[in-house]
Protein backbone atom coordinates (compact mmCIF):
# COMPACT_ATOMS: atom_id res chain seq x y z
CA UNK A 1 0.00 0.00 0.00
CA UNK A 2 1.37 3.37 -1.00
CA UNK A 3 0.69 6.10 1.55
CA UNK A 4 -0.85 9.26 0.07
CA UNK A 5 -0.21 12.00 2.61
CA UNK A 6 -2.75 14.39 1.10
CA UNK A 7 -5.38 11.65 1.19
CA UNK A 8 -4.64 10.83 4.83
CA UNK A 9 -4.74 14.49 5.83
CA UNK A 10 -8.10 14.96 4.09
CA UNK A 11 -9.55 11.91 5.83
CA UNK A 12 -8.56 13.28 9.25
CA UNK A 13 -10.77 16.30 8.56
CA UNK A 14 -13.76 13.96 8.15
CA UNK A 15 -12.98 11.17 10.60
CA UNK A 16 -11.62 11.33 14.11
CA UNK A 17 -8.26 9.71 14.70
CA UNK A 18 -7.10 7.12 15.38
CA UNK A 19 -8.35 5.04 12.45
CA UNK A 20 -7.38 2.18 10.18
CA UNK A 21 -7.41 2.74 6.42
CA UNK A 22 -7.49 -0.33 4.16
CA UNK A 23 -6.72 -0.30 0.44
CA UNK A 24 -9.21 -2.72 -1.10
CA UNK A 25 -7.70 -2.43 -4.57
CA UNK A 26 -4.29 -3.42 -3.19
CA UNK A 27 -5.82 -6.39 -1.35
CA UNK A 28 -7.54 -7.65 -4.49
CA UNK A 29 -4.49 -7.26 -6.73
CA UNK A 30 -2.28 -8.92 -4.12
CA UNK A 31 -4.61 -11.90 -3.76
CA UNK A 32 -5.22 -12.32 -7.49
CA UNK A 33 -1.48 -12.39 -8.14
CA UNK A 34 -1.12 -15.16 -5.55
CA UNK A 35 -4.08 -17.02 -7.01
CA UNK A 36 -2.79 -16.79 -10.58
CA UNK A 37 0.55 -18.33 -9.59
CA UNK A 38 -0.97 -21.29 -7.76
CA UNK A 39 -2.29 -24.65 -8.97
CA UNK A 40 -6.12 -24.47 -9.26
CA UNK A 41 -6.30 -27.66 -7.18
CA UNK A 42 -5.14 -25.58 -4.20
CA UNK A 43 -7.85 -23.55 -2.50
CA UNK A 44 -7.09 -20.52 -0.34
CA UNK A 45 -8.78 -20.00 3.01
CA UNK A 46 -8.77 -16.68 4.84
CA UNK A 47 -7.56 -16.93 8.46
CA UNK A 48 -10.16 -14.75 10.14
CA UNK A 49 -8.01 -14.30 13.26
CA UNK A 50 -5.73 -11.98 11.31
CA UNK A 51 -8.54 -9.47 10.82
CA UNK A 52 -12.13 -10.09 11.82
CA UNK A 53 -13.82 -7.20 10.01
CA UNK A 54 -16.69 -8.81 8.12
CA UNK A 55 -16.55 -6.24 5.31
CA UNK A 56 -13.03 -7.38 4.42
CA UNK A 57 -14.09 -11.01 4.81
CA UNK A 58 -16.94 -10.40 2.36
CA UNK A 59 -14.44 -9.32 -0.29
CA UNK A 60 -12.49 -12.56 0.06
CA UNK A 61 -15.72 -14.56 -0.09
CA UNK A 62 -16.61 -12.80 -3.34
CA UNK A 63 -13.19 -13.71 -4.73
CA UNK A 64 -13.76 -17.39 -4.00
CA UNK A 65 -11.86 -18.03 -0.78
CA UNK A 66 -13.04 -20.20 2.08
CA UNK A 67 -12.54 -19.15 5.69
CA UNK A 68 -10.76 -20.66 8.70
CA UNK A 69 -12.24 -19.84 12.10
CA UNK A 70 -11.04 -20.65 15.61
CA UNK A 71 -14.04 -19.96 17.84
CA UNK A 72 -17.82 -19.93 17.79
CA UNK A 73 -17.59 -16.14 17.63
CA UNK A 74 -15.49 -16.26 14.48
CA UNK A 75 -17.88 -18.85 13.05
CA UNK A 76 -20.74 -16.40 13.59
CA UNK A 77 -18.70 -13.61 11.97
CA UNK A 78 -18.00 -15.84 8.97
CA UNK A 79 -21.70 -16.53 8.52
CA UNK A 80 -22.45 -12.79 8.82
CA UNK A 81 -19.90 -12.24 6.06
CA UNK A 82 -21.90 -14.61 3.86
CA UNK A 83 -19.67 -17.69 3.87
CA UNK A 84 -21.64 -20.87 3.34
CA UNK A 85 -21.12 -23.68 5.84
CA UNK A 86 -19.36 -25.84 3.26
CA UNK A 87 -16.62 -23.21 2.93
CA UNK A 88 -15.76 -23.00 6.64
CA UNK A 89 -13.12 -24.94 8.58
CA UNK A 90 -12.83 -24.74 12.37
CA UNK A 91 -9.45 -25.11 14.08
CA UNK A 92 -8.05 -24.49 17.56
CA UNK A 93 -6.68 -26.66 20.38
CA UNK A 94 -9.32 -25.82 22.99
CA UNK A 95 -12.76 -25.96 21.40
CA UNK A 96 -15.52 -26.13 24.01
CA UNK A 97 -18.24 -28.74 23.63
CA UNK A 98 -20.75 -25.93 23.07
CA UNK A 99 -18.62 -24.66 20.17
CA UNK A 100 -18.29 -28.13 18.68
CA UNK A 101 -22.05 -28.51 18.96
CA UNK A 102 -22.57 -25.32 16.95
CA UNK A 103 -20.07 -26.52 14.34
CA UNK A 104 -21.79 -29.91 14.02
CA UNK A 105 -25.23 -28.31 13.81
CA UNK A 106 -24.00 -25.86 11.17
CA UNK A 107 -22.68 -28.61 8.91
CA UNK A 108 -19.39 -26.86 8.19
CA UNK A 109 -16.92 -28.35 5.73
CA UNK A 110 -14.52 -29.58 8.36
CA UNK A 111 -13.68 -29.50 12.05
CA UNK A 112 -9.94 -29.83 12.55
CA UNK A 113 -9.60 -32.13 15.56
CA UNK A 114 -6.52 -31.54 17.69
CA UNK A 115 -6.81 -34.47 20.13
CA UNK A 116 -8.34 -37.94 20.32
CA UNK A 117 -10.66 -36.67 23.06
CA UNK A 118 -11.94 -34.02 20.69
CA UNK A 119 -12.66 -36.68 18.07
CA UNK A 120 -14.84 -38.53 20.57
CA UNK A 121 -16.62 -35.32 21.62
CA UNK A 122 -17.44 -34.64 17.97
CA UNK A 123 -18.67 -38.22 17.52
CA UNK A 124 -20.93 -37.92 20.57
CA UNK A 125 -22.39 -34.62 19.38
CA UNK A 126 -22.88 -35.87 15.83
CA UNK A 127 -24.79 -38.90 17.14
CA UNK A 128 -26.93 -36.63 19.32
CA UNK A 129 -27.74 -34.40 16.32
CA UNK A 130 -28.13 -37.41 14.00
CA UNK A 131 -25.69 -35.79 11.58
CA UNK A 132 -22.44 -36.77 9.95
CA UNK A 133 -19.65 -34.49 11.12
CA UNK A 134 -16.61 -34.07 8.89
CA UNK A 135 -13.20 -33.96 10.56
CA UNK A 136 -9.56 -33.62 9.67
CA UNK A 137 -6.81 -34.32 12.17
CA UNK A 138 -4.09 -31.80 12.91
CA UNK A 139 -0.70 -33.49 13.00
CA UNK A 140 2.33 -32.14 14.82
CA UNK A 141 5.08 -33.53 12.58
CA UNK A 142 8.09 -35.40 13.91
CA UNK A 143 10.30 -33.03 11.94
CA UNK A 144 11.00 -29.34 12.58
CA UNK A 145 11.20 -27.08 9.53
CA UNK A 146 13.83 -24.36 9.77
CA UNK A 147 13.38 -20.97 11.36
CA UNK A 148 10.08 -19.18 11.75
CA UNK A 149 9.00 -16.33 14.02
CA UNK A 150 6.57 -18.50 16.00
CA UNK A 151 6.92 -22.29 15.81
CA UNK A 152 3.63 -24.18 16.04
CA UNK A 153 4.72 -27.64 14.94
CA UNK A 154 7.72 -29.94 14.92
CA UNK A 155 8.35 -29.03 18.57
CA UNK A 156 6.38 -29.67 21.79
CA UNK A 157 3.19 -27.65 21.40
CA UNK A 158 -0.46 -27.70 22.44
CA UNK A 159 -1.49 -27.91 18.79
CA UNK A 160 -2.54 -31.13 17.11
CA UNK A 161 -1.49 -34.72 17.71
CA UNK A 162 2.09 -35.92 17.47
CA UNK A 163 2.90 -37.78 14.29
CA UNK A 164 4.32 -40.60 16.43
CA UNK A 165 0.78 -41.17 17.78
CA UNK A 166 -0.68 -41.74 14.33
CA UNK A 167 -1.46 -45.44 14.84
CA UNK A 168 -3.55 -44.72 17.93
CA UNK A 169 -5.21 -41.74 16.27
CA UNK A 170 -6.20 -43.75 13.20
CA UNK A 171 -7.55 -46.53 15.44
CA UNK A 172 -9.81 -43.90 16.99
CA UNK A 173 -10.79 -42.63 13.54
CA UNK A 174 -11.80 -46.14 12.44
CA UNK A 175 -14.11 -46.46 15.45
CA UNK A 176 -16.18 -43.41 14.49
CA UNK A 177 -19.67 -44.01 13.13
CA UNK A 178 -21.18 -40.52 12.93
CA UNK A 179 -17.95 -38.71 12.09
CA UNK A 180 -16.30 -38.85 8.69
CA UNK A 181 -12.53 -38.54 8.49
CA UNK A 182 -11.68 -36.40 5.46
CA UNK A 183 -8.02 -35.55 5.84
CA UNK A 184 -5.11 -33.92 7.61
CA UNK A 185 -3.82 -30.51 8.59
CA UNK A 186 -0.24 -29.44 9.34
CA UNK A 187 0.65 -25.90 10.41
CA UNK A 188 4.23 -25.50 11.54
CA UNK A 189 4.55 -21.77 12.20
CA UNK A 190 3.44 -18.22 11.54
CA UNK A 191 5.22 -15.11 10.22
CA UNK A 192 7.58 -17.44 8.38
CA UNK A 193 10.06 -15.64 6.13
CA UNK A 194 12.03 -18.79 5.30
CA UNK A 195 11.01 -19.74 1.76
CA UNK A 196 12.57 -23.19 1.82
CA UNK A 197 11.08 -24.17 5.19
CA UNK A 198 7.57 -23.37 3.93
CA UNK A 199 8.14 -25.48 0.83
CA UNK A 200 9.59 -28.33 2.89
CA UNK A 201 6.69 -28.27 5.34
CA UNK A 202 4.06 -28.31 2.60
CA UNK A 203 5.76 -31.14 0.71
CA UNK A 204 6.04 -33.07 3.96
CA UNK A 205 2.29 -32.64 4.50
CA UNK A 206 1.52 -34.07 1.06
CA UNK A 207 3.80 -37.00 1.88
CA UNK A 208 1.93 -37.54 5.16
CA UNK A 209 -1.23 -37.93 3.12
CA UNK A 210 0.53 -40.57 1.01
CA UNK A 211 1.71 -42.36 4.15
CA UNK A 212 -1.80 -42.48 5.57
CA UNK A 213 -3.01 -44.13 2.38
CA UNK A 214 -0.17 -46.65 2.33
CA UNK A 215 -0.39 -47.52 6.05
CA UNK A 216 -4.13 -47.34 6.65
CA UNK A 217 -5.73 -47.57 3.21
CA UNK A 218 -7.51 -44.23 3.62
CA UNK A 219 -7.44 -41.58 0.90
CA UNK A 220 -7.46 -38.02 2.23
CA UNK A 221 -10.27 -36.02 0.68
CA UNK A 222 -8.63 -32.86 2.03
CA UNK A 223 -4.99 -32.05 2.73
CA UNK A 224 -4.56 -28.72 4.52
CA UNK A 225 -1.00 -27.56 3.87
CA UNK A 226 -1.14 -24.80 6.47
CA UNK A 227 0.37 -21.46 5.56
CA UNK A 228 2.24 -19.05 7.76
CA UNK A 229 3.48 -16.84 4.91
CA UNK A 230 5.27 -13.93 6.56
CA UNK A 231 5.75 -10.32 5.51
CA UNK A 232 8.84 -8.16 6.18
CA UNK A 233 7.93 -5.62 8.85
CA UNK A 234 11.44 -4.46 9.64
CA UNK A 235 14.41 -3.30 7.57
CA UNK A 236 16.51 -6.38 8.38
CA UNK A 237 13.82 -8.77 7.10
CA UNK A 238 13.62 -10.04 3.51
CA UNK A 239 10.43 -10.88 1.65
CA UNK A 240 9.54 -14.45 0.79
CA UNK A 241 10.22 -15.74 -2.69
CA UNK A 242 6.50 -16.31 -3.17
CA UNK A 243 7.00 -17.31 -6.80
CA UNK A 244 9.30 -20.15 -5.77
CA UNK A 245 6.82 -21.30 -3.12
CA UNK A 246 3.78 -21.32 -5.39
CA UNK A 247 5.67 -22.88 -8.30
CA UNK A 248 7.29 -25.66 -6.27
CA UNK A 249 4.24 -26.50 -4.16
CA UNK A 250 1.94 -26.38 -7.19
CA UNK A 251 4.14 -28.87 -9.05
CA UNK A 252 4.30 -31.18 -6.04
CA UNK A 253 0.53 -31.07 -5.59
CA UNK A 254 0.00 -31.79 -9.28
CA UNK A 255 2.26 -34.83 -9.08
CA UNK A 256 0.26 -36.06 -6.08
CA UNK A 257 -3.03 -35.57 -7.92
CA UNK A 258 -1.71 -37.40 -10.96
CA UNK A 259 -0.54 -40.41 -8.94
CA UNK A 260 -2.60 -40.78 -5.76
CA UNK A 261 -5.06 -37.98 -5.04
CA UNK A 262 -7.03 -37.13 -8.20
CA UNK A 263 -10.05 -35.84 -6.24
CA UNK A 264 -8.29 -34.40 -3.19
CA UNK A 265 -8.75 -30.76 -2.21
CA UNK A 266 -5.57 -29.01 -1.09
CA UNK A 267 -5.82 -25.95 1.15
CA UNK A 268 -3.48 -23.09 2.02
CA UNK A 269 -4.49 -20.77 4.86
CA UNK A 270 -3.45 -17.13 4.86
CA UNK A 271 -4.28 -13.99 6.77
CA UNK A 272 -1.16 -11.96 7.43
CA UNK A 273 0.21 -12.31 3.89
CA UNK A 274 -3.10 -11.29 2.34
CA UNK A 275 -3.74 -8.26 4.53
CA UNK A 276 -0.73 -6.96 6.47
CA UNK A 277 0.65 -4.60 3.84
CA UNK A 278 -2.78 -3.30 2.82
CA UNK A 279 -3.51 -0.92 5.70
CA UNK A 280 -2.20 1.98 7.73
CA UNK A 281 -3.05 2.93 11.32
CA UNK A 282 -3.33 6.72 11.58
CA UNK A 283 -2.79 8.55 14.87
CA UNK A 284 -2.57 12.22 15.81
CA UNK A 285 0.07 13.84 18.00
CA UNK A 286 -1.46 15.14 21.25
CA UNK A 287 1.59 16.34 23.15
CA UNK A 288 5.36 16.53 23.06
CA UNK A 289 7.40 16.59 26.24
CA UNK A 290 10.89 16.08 27.56
CA UNK A 291 11.88 13.74 30.38
CA UNK A 292 15.43 13.45 31.70
CA UNK A 293 16.99 14.42 28.42
CA UNK A 294 14.69 12.41 26.14
CA UNK A 295 11.86 13.67 23.93
CA UNK A 296 8.49 11.92 24.04
CA UNK A 297 5.72 12.38 21.49
CA UNK A 298 2.29 11.29 22.77
CA UNK A 299 -0.26 10.19 20.17
CA UNK A 300 -3.94 9.27 20.51
CA UNK A 301 -3.58 5.63 19.41
CA UNK A 302 -1.53 2.75 20.65
CA UNK A 303 -1.45 -0.69 22.25
CA UNK A 304 -5.22 -0.92 22.80
CA UNK A 305 -5.77 -0.74 19.03
CA UNK A 306 -2.53 -2.11 17.60
CA UNK A 307 -0.73 -4.21 20.20
CA UNK A 308 1.50 -5.93 17.66
CA UNK A 309 3.21 -2.65 16.78
CA UNK A 310 3.95 -1.71 20.39
CA UNK A 311 6.38 -2.98 23.00
CA UNK A 312 3.76 -5.07 24.79
CA UNK A 313 5.38 -8.11 26.39
CA UNK A 314 8.77 -7.57 24.73
CA UNK A 315 11.97 -6.23 26.21
CA UNK A 316 13.81 -5.93 22.88
CA UNK A 317 12.35 -5.42 19.43
CA UNK A 318 12.34 -3.29 16.30
CA UNK A 319 9.95 -0.48 15.46
CA UNK A 320 7.22 -0.94 12.88
CA UNK A 321 7.72 1.19 9.76
CA UNK A 322 6.07 4.59 10.16
CA UNK A 323 5.52 7.74 8.16
CA UNK A 324 5.01 11.20 9.57
CA UNK A 325 2.76 13.91 8.18
CA UNK A 326 3.30 17.51 9.37
CA UNK A 327 -0.05 19.26 9.54
CA UNK A 328 0.65 22.54 11.36
CA UNK A 329 0.53 25.69 9.28
CA UNK A 330 4.18 26.47 10.10
CA UNK A 331 5.35 23.01 9.01
CA UNK A 332 8.28 24.02 6.88
CA UNK A 333 11.60 22.22 7.01
CA UNK A 334 12.06 20.52 10.37
CA UNK A 335 15.25 19.20 11.87
CA UNK A 336 15.51 15.48 12.59
CA UNK A 337 15.40 14.48 16.23
CA UNK A 338 15.43 11.24 18.20
CA UNK A 339 12.14 10.63 20.01
CA UNK A 340 10.02 7.95 21.62
CA UNK A 341 6.47 7.77 20.26
CA UNK A 342 4.05 6.66 22.96
CA UNK A 343 0.32 6.05 23.09
CA UNK A 344 -2.20 7.37 25.63
CA UNK A 345 -2.30 4.36 27.96
CA UNK A 346 -0.99 4.19 31.52
CA UNK A 347 1.74 1.66 30.81
CA UNK A 348 5.29 2.00 29.44
CA UNK A 349 4.49 -0.88 27.07
CA UNK A 350 2.30 1.52 25.08
CA UNK A 351 5.21 2.54 22.89
CA UNK A 352 4.84 2.71 19.10
CA UNK A 353 8.43 3.71 18.42
CA UNK A 354 11.57 3.79 20.55
CA UNK A 355 14.47 6.09 19.63
CA UNK A 356 13.12 6.85 16.17
CA UNK A 357 14.68 9.63 14.11
CA UNK A 358 11.89 11.84 12.77
CA UNK A 359 11.30 15.42 11.69
CA UNK A 360 10.26 17.32 14.83
CA UNK A 361 6.64 16.43 15.63
CA UNK A 362 4.08 18.74 17.25
CA UNK A 363 0.43 18.50 18.33
CA UNK A 364 -1.82 18.02 15.31
CA UNK A 365 0.80 16.21 13.23
CA UNK A 366 0.08 12.64 12.13
CA UNK A 367 1.98 9.44 12.83
CA UNK A 368 1.04 6.60 10.46
CA UNK A 369 1.94 2.99 11.26
CA UNK A 370 2.40 0.97 8.08
CA UNK A 371 1.84 -2.77 7.50
CA UNK A 372 -1.16 -2.66 9.84
CA UNK A 373 -3.72 -4.78 7.99
CA UNK A 374 -3.24 -8.01 9.95
CA UNK A 375 -3.17 -8.69 13.69
CA UNK A 376 -4.05 -5.08 14.42
CA UNK A 377 -7.37 -4.48 16.14
CA UNK A 378 -8.23 -8.20 16.32
CA UNK A 379 -5.03 -8.84 18.33
CA UNK A 380 -5.34 -5.92 20.75
CA UNK A 381 -6.65 -5.38 24.33
CA UNK A 382 -9.45 -3.06 23.24
CA UNK A 383 -11.08 -2.83 26.69
CA UNK A 384 -7.92 -1.74 28.49
CA UNK A 385 -8.57 1.69 30.09
CA UNK A 386 -11.93 2.03 28.35
CA UNK A 387 -10.86 3.91 25.24
CA UNK A 388 -13.23 3.58 22.26
CA UNK A 389 -12.43 1.20 19.44
CA UNK A 390 -11.17 3.03 16.34
CA UNK A 391 -12.89 3.75 13.09
CA UNK A 392 -12.03 1.50 10.14
CA UNK A 393 -12.26 2.77 6.56
CA UNK A 394 -12.10 0.80 3.32
CA UNK A 395 -10.93 2.53 0.16
CA UNK A 396 -11.97 0.78 -3.03
CA UNK A 397 -12.41 1.93 -6.63
CA UNK A 398 -11.87 5.54 -5.58
CA UNK A 399 -14.58 5.46 -2.91
CA UNK A 400 -14.41 5.29 0.86
CA UNK A 401 -16.63 3.13 3.04
CA UNK A 402 -16.88 3.28 6.82
CA UNK A 403 -16.63 -0.38 7.85
CA UNK A 404 -16.41 0.10 11.63
CA UNK A 405 -17.86 3.00 13.58
CA UNK A 406 -16.06 4.57 16.49
CA UNK A 407 -16.72 2.71 19.73
CA UNK A 408 -18.70 4.25 22.57
CA UNK A 409 -18.87 3.97 26.35
CA UNK A 410 -22.08 2.00 25.87
CA UNK A 411 -20.08 -0.70 24.07
CA UNK A 412 -17.89 -1.12 27.13
CA UNK A 413 -20.79 -1.66 29.55
CA UNK A 414 -23.06 -3.55 27.13
CA UNK A 415 -22.26 -6.98 28.56
CA UNK A 416 -22.04 -5.87 32.19
CA UNK A 417 -25.20 -6.47 34.21
CA UNK A 418 -26.53 -3.35 35.89
CA UNK A 419 -29.08 -4.33 38.57
CA UNK A 420 -29.04 -6.12 41.91
CA UNK A 421 -31.59 -8.63 40.57
CA UNK A 422 -28.72 -10.42 38.82
CA UNK A 423 -27.68 -12.12 42.07
CA UNK A 424 -27.40 -15.85 41.34
CA UNK A 425 -26.72 -17.31 44.80
CA UNK A 426 -25.34 -16.55 48.21
CA UNK A 427 -22.49 -18.72 49.46
CA UNK A 428 -23.10 -19.38 53.17
UniProtKB/Swiss-Prot annotation:
N6-(pyridoxal phosphate)lysine modification sites?
49
List this protein's GO terms for biological process. Answer: antibiotic biosynthetic process; lysine biosynthetic process via diaminopimelate
Cell membrane keyword on record: no
Which InterPro entries did the record assign?
Ala_racemase/Decarboxylase_C, DAP_deCOOHase_LysA, De-COase2_C, De-COase2_CS, De-COase2_N, Orn/DAP/Arg_de-COase, PLP-binding_barrel
Which E.C. number(s) belong to this protein?
A: 4.1.1.95
Catalytic activity of the protein: gamma-L-glutamyl-[BtrI ACP] + H(+) = 4-aminobutanoyl-[BtrI ACP] + CO2
Which pathway is it part of? Antibiotic biosynthesis; butirosin biosynthesis
Q: Which residues bind pyridoxal 5'-phosphate?
A: 228, 269-272, 375
Hey, which family's this protein in?
Belongs to the Orn/Lys/Arg decarboxylase class-II family.
Q: How does it assemble?
A: Homodimer.
Q: What is this protein called?
A: L-glutamyl-[BtrI acyl-carrier protein] decarboxylase
Give the species this sequence originates from.
Niallia circulans (Bacillus circulans)
